Regions:
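Extended, non-catalytic scaffold segments that flank or surround catalytic motifs
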Residues: 3-44, 109, 115-118, 126-127, ...
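Short, positively charged
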Residues: 110-141, 277-313, 318, 367
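A short glycine-rich beta-alpha junction/loop motif
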Residues: 90-98, 130-159, 269-271, 303-326
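Sequence-specific dsDNA recognition surfaces
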Residues: 7-23, 37-70, 206-247, 256-275, ...
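Short, charged beta-turn/beta-strand-edge "cap" motif at the junction between a beta-strand
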Residues: 76-80, 258
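Non-catalytic DNA-recognition/assembly elements of restriction-modification systems
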Residues: 1-17, 144-234, 323-367
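Short, conserved secondary-structure segments in the cores of folded domains
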Residues: 61, 87-88
């Protein structure tokens, strides 16, 4: 085991800024640019991805990303980073990022990425960041981070077992994306047939199917090691120590990007999050009706200033209930499949997070 500073095994480079790269160089479709909002914990968040043309990437070729690069954000949640895989090779580093490129052939980039995800290292990065109002990271702070390096063979073993768990999680996410597409197609097909008279039923509104409840907690209620899920207006789901709700529920963000989620189990909710618990029969149907109504609300209000969704907006979500209950059963079946895969992912993530520090500090070893 040897201890090295990150700067000793890598090249650190900040993204292009100032006169090098301007916002008007972004295009609708092109080569993806990784900015702070696209950086998760070891992964890339593709929602809201920006794009630039080939000529921009060629001009700023020093900022072209390669497989194995590790990318941090310079501001905000500075303990987050993403590892560039073969899929993202050739993408561009954004202005507000720091790229770490491993230059030591005895160091495995994926091992370093996992090492940087340990709670101890994330806390060290957060504590080292500068700035009174917003945490800020620079190459000096990042380069000073110490890494405990086992042999290259041991690095490979550790990274392989952790990445196998992440691969299973990613596979489940892809299945859930497919199930979400099937759900939406099924709902759109039903609503299309309603217009032509091919499907009969009756119209109602959300408040006829369920009470509309809001969470009571503020953001400080979150606890990273909490046992229960804590739903806020963010796309990310947090954890907390106490639950209030225990049912199949639809959760609608009352501000922010107005996202719609569903979950079965014990949880708590932020004060601007609406909780709908319609019972199992109409669970999937109300989820889809809410999803499409909120998306419609967002698209019709584009360009105007909409700070929040009111309880009245939620109460009046239109819901068509088909006479054929087989449709409801199909929707619920797909929705519950999604939740089963998500439960498996939660268990896999917990296993990975339990193994991670133990493998890194030598408490657990991998036999051949």
């Amino acid at each position: 085991m040897r201890v090295v500073k990150l700067v000793e095994i890598s090249e650190l480079k900040t993204g292009p800024f100032g006169t090098q790269f301007s916002a008007n160089e972004y295009v609708i479709d092109g080569i993806p640019v990784i900015n702070v909002k696209n950086i998760g914990y070891g992964n890339i968040i593709e929602t809201g991805m920006g794009y630039v043309g080939q000529s921009t990437v060629e001009r700023l070729s020093d900022h072209r990303l390669q497989e194995g690069d590790i990318v941090f954000g310079r501001k905000g949640s500075v303990d987050r980073h993403c590892l560039i895989t073969k899929v993202q090779d050739g993408w561009m580093q954004g202005s507000d990022c720091i790229r770490v490129r491993i230059t030591d052939s005895s160091v495995l980039p994926s091992f370093v990425s996992y090492y940087l995800l340990t709670d101890a290292l994330k806390a060290k990065i957060n504590n080292s960041a500068v700035g009174s109002t917003m945490a800020s990271l620079n190459t000096d702070i990042l380069g000073d981070i110490e890494i405990n390096l086992p042999t290259y063979e041991e690095q490979c073993k550790i990274a392989n077992i952790l990445s196998s768990i992440d691969s299973k999680i990613e596979n489940n996410n892809e299945i859930n994306d497919y199930l979400e597409q099937k759900l939406r197609l099924l709902y759109e097909h039903m609503m299309s047939n309603v217009q032509t008279g091919g499907v009969t039923g009756h119209n109602t509104i959300a408040s006829a199917l369920t009470d509309i409840i809001t969470g009571k907690e503020d953001a400080n209620f979150a606890s990273p090691a909490g046992k229960y899920k804590f739903f806020t207006c963010s796309n990310d789901t947090l954890r907390c120590d106490k639950y209030v709700f225990n049912a199949s529920s639809i959760l609608i963000a009352g501000n922010g990007d107005f996202n719609v989620k569903h979950y079965t189990g014990r949880f708590n909710a932020y004060q601007r999050t609406y909780v709908l618990m319609p019972g199992r029969k109409y669970y999937g149907l109300l989820y889809l009706a809410s999803l499409y109504q909120i998306n419609s609300f967002k698209s019709t209000s584009a360009g105007s200033i909409v700070k929040f969704i009111t309880k009245g907006d939620i109460e009046n979500i239109p819901v068509f209930i088909p006479d054929n209950e087989e449709v409801l059963s199909k929707i619920n079946h797909l929705l519950m499949l999604q939740e089963q895969y998500q439960v498996e992912n939660d268990e896999l993530a917990a296993l990975r997070d339990w193994l991670l520090p133990m493998l890194m500090n030598g408490q657990a070893t991998i036999e051949d």
